[in-house]
Amino acid sequence: MNHRISFRLMEAVSGDTLEVFLDERLSFKENFKMLKSLCEKDYTKAEVYDPYKKVFLDRNTSLSEFGFQGFVFLKLFL
């Protein structure tokens, strides 16, 4: 996981919405897996959504229905 993202999450409080920039060195699929793992493991009540499609990411979201435009928003419910 990107250390910058981890650090920002550690300082976040419940209800915060963080802008998360995707790692350009990773493929679309790798970025998707990284964000999905945030929701499923570290922050089980987090929601990630594409600001253009307004689709929330959870453990049932498939790669084909989710598109990234360079960044997403992560909202925490701790």
Language model feature labels by segment:
Residues 1-78:
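Ubiquitin system architectures
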